[in-house]
């Protein structure tokens, strides 16, 4: 059916109200077709000391995405920003992202997350692909890719994720039945957080944690709390010079290191268990780590390092889009009903072969793309340019840090007509691959891309064919930058059984 449902809210505010603003991207059309030097790129200026005070006061920079969005409004589709002695160039057009992708080397580089690197160095631990550049990154990445991104790997882990998604559905049904009103209103974020940890841990280590019930064991609860703590403290440490934060943020550093220590110990125990199973004749079930151990192409230190990063990286990147998708579907009941009809029509085929969810649910896949357009988990993608490039008629030299703003791209009316409206159908009608960059691109795309897609598709498929999702909240959810883009508070959602 034709989907014309639209949110009653203007998601691009407050910038649409600014009298000085213009449509994003107009500067490129007005610029003469002549090469300009790097120094001619419009510069965004802020007092460095005031910026530091703001970060200290906020314990991070919750409005970073909005600040950069406003800068695009003022300066056009490309600008540069000084971060100390480092110049960062910000861009936000799909054609620029495509040009950067085409110029990528076989081992693209980006700046490394300093607080995480500091923990590994202080503890004498190896680093995985998320914290590596150069030949070592490429060596690790080429050996992990087949077990995370290949069709063969997806075929292996889809039934595992489906099992967890079905268990979550049963958990939700019990909660609803236990309620005298025959419905359930809840803050869904913690449930989604636990679901993604449960599913990812099962795929990585072949072991269930038991996070879908009400009574978590103390070890699992500490594990969940430690992952939450890492996500909370990381942005407080990454936006200021490390020398300064080590002097004024010792409590935050300690919390971050203690949390990493606990997660590292937890992951190490699981990797060792898998190793012992492989050595004694083979694991009981397929898992990513069992494949890496059996293959023997990576050292145990490298397997431990990558297991740690895959565990930490599998949480908010999936749970936030799930919450925001359910929220938008609750605000757009016509879209929700169309998705439900699609899931009910595909129920038999997906039940027989869960992998069919990837092909038989095109509208649901479009819904996820639309959610990630409005609420990209990563505010921007980063590259350190390996060669000189001409971007928007400006010369940008090799070695420059480039940030591609996904938040502003998703709100650009020149790229997405009526960007303030929630219109999943737009993704059924377009082919631009560089308009959907949530999981990155090229050889450095998100390693957990396929797993995240499967986790989201199957969970939403099972929940939406069984429940109507409603909300009384009509206003926009305030999104804040906390290492990933997340809601400042999770919207209250109500689940009612489908009659």
Swiss-Prot record:
Q: Does the keyword Membrane apply?
A: yes
The membrane topology of this protein is: Peripheral membrane protein
Task: Transit peptide span, please give it.
Answer: 1-24
Q: Which UniProt keywords apply?
A: Heme, Iron, Membrane, Metal-binding, Mitochondrion, Mitochondrion inner membrane, Monooxygenase, Oxidoreductase, Steroidogenesis, Transit peptide
Family annotation (Pfam families): p450
Asked if the keyword Ribosomal protein belongs to this entry, the reply reads no
Pathway it belongs to? Steroid biosynthesis; glucocorticoid biosynthesis; Steroid hormone biosynthesis
Q: Which GO terms describe its molecular function?
A: corticosterone 18-monooxygenase activity; heme binding; iron ion binding; steroid 11-beta-monooxygenase activity
Q: What is its EC number?
A: 1.14.15.4
The protein's matches in PROSITE patterns, at most eight in alphabetical order, are given as: CYTOCHROME_P450 (PS00086)
Q: Where in the cell is it found?
A: Mitochondrion inner membrane
Catalytic activity reads:
a steroid + 2 reduced [adrenodoxin] + O2 + 2 H(+) = an 11beta-hydroxysteroid + 2 oxidized [adrenodoxin] + H2O; 11-deoxycortisol + 2 reduced [adrenodoxin] + O2 + 2 H(+) = cortisol + 2 oxidized [adrenodoxin] + H2O; 21-hydroxyprogesterone + 2 reduced [adrenodoxin] + O2 + 2 H(+) = corticosterone + 2 oxidized [adrenodoxin] + H2O; 21-hydroxyprogesterone + 2 reduced [adrenodoxin] + O2 + 2 H(+) = 18-hydroxy-11-deoxycorticosterone + 2 oxidized [adrenodoxin] + H2O
What does the entry list under GO cellular component?
Answer: mitochondrial inner membrane
Coiled-coil ranges per UniProt: none
GO terms for biological process?
aldosterone biosynthetic process; cellular response to peptide hormone stimulus; cholesterol metabolic process; cortisol metabolic process; glucocorticoid biosynthetic process
User: SUPFAM superfamilies in the record, alphabetically?
Assistant: Cytochrome P450
Annotated residues for binding of heme: 446
Q: What cofactor does this one take? A: heme
Top-tier EC class: oxidoreductase
Q: Could you tell me which InterPro entries the record lists for this protein?
A: CYP11_CYP27_families, Cyt_P450, Cyt_P450_CS, Cyt_P450_mitochondrial, Cyt_P450_sf
- What does this protein's UniProt record list under function? A cytochrome P450 monooxygenase involved in the biosynthesis of adrenal corticoids. Catalyzes a variety of reactions that are essential for many species, including detoxification, defense, and the formation of endogenous chemicals like steroid hormones. Steroid 11beta, 18- and 19-hydroxylase with preferred regioselectivity at 11beta, then 18, and lastly 19. Catalyzes the hydroxylation of 11-deoxycortisol and 11-deoxycorticosterone (21-hydroxyprogesterone) at 11beta position, yielding cortisol or corticosterone, respectively, but cannot produce aldosterone.
Q: Which family would the database say this protein is a member of?
A: Belongs to the cytochrome P450 family.
The protein's name: Cytochrome P450 11B1, mitochondrial
UniProt organism field: Mesocricetus auratus
Provide the gene name from the record: CYP11B1
């Amino acid at each position: 059916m034709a989907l014309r449902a639209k949110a009653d809210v203007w998601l691009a505010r407050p910038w649409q109200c600014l009298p000085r603003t213009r449509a994003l991207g107009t500067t490129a059309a007005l610029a003469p077709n002549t090469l300009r030097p790097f120094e001619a790129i419009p510069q965004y200026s802020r007092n460095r000391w005031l910026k530091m005070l703001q970060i200290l006061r906020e314990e991070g920079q919750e409005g970073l995405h909005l600040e950069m969005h406003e800068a695009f409004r003022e300066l056009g589709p490309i600008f540069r920003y000084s971060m100390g002695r480092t110049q960062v160039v910000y861009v936000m057009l799909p054609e620029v992202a495509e040009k950067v992708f085409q110029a990528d080397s076989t081992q693209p580089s980006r700046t490394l997350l300093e607080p995480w690197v500091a923990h590994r160095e202080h503890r004498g631990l190896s680093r995985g692909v998320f914290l590596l550049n150069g030949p070592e990154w490429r060596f690790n990445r080429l050996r992990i890719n087949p077990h995370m991104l290949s069709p063969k790997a997806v075929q292996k882990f889809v039934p595992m994720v489906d099992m967890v998604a079905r268990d979550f559905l049963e958990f939700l049904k019990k909660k609803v039945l236990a309620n005298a009103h025959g419905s359930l209103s809840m803050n869904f974020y913690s449930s989604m957080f636990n679901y993604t940890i449960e599913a990812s841990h099962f795929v990585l280590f072949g072991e269930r944690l038991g996070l879908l019930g009400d009574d978590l064991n103390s070890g699992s609860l500490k594990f969940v709390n430690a992952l939450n703590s890492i996500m909370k403290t990381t942005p407080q440490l990454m936006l200021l010079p490390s020398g300064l934060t080590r002097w004024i943020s010792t409590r935050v550093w300690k919390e971050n290191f203690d949390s990493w220590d606990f997660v590292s110990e937890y992951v190490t125990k699981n990797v060792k268990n898998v190793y012992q199973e492989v050595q004694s004749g083979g694991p009981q079930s397929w898992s990513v780590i069992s494949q890496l151990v059996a293959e023997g192409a990576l050292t145990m230190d490298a397997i431990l390092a990558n297991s740690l990063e895959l565990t930490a990286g599998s949480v908010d990147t999936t749970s936030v889009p799930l919450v925001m998708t359910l929220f938008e579907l609750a605000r757009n009941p016509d879209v929700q009903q169309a998705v439900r009809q699609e899931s009910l029509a595909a129920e038999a085929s997906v039940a027989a072969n869960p992998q069919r969810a990837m092909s038989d649910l095109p509208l649901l896949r479009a819904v996820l793309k639309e959610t990630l357009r409005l609420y990209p988990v990563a505010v921007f993608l980063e590259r350190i340019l390996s060669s000189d490039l001409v971007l928007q008629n400006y010369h940008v030299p090799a070695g420059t840090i480039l940030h591609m703003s996904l938040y502003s791209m998703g709100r650009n009316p020149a790229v997405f007509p009526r960007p303030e409206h929630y219109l999943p159908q737009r993704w059924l009608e377009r082919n631009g691959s560089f308009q959907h960059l949530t999981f990155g691109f090229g050889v450095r795309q998100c390693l957990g891309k396929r797993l995240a897609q499967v986790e989201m598709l199957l969970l939403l498929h099972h929940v939406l064919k069984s429940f109507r999702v409603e909300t009384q909240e009509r206003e926009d959810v305030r999104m804040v930058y906390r290492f990933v883009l997340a809601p400042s508070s999770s919207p209250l959602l109500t689940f009612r059984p489908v009659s």
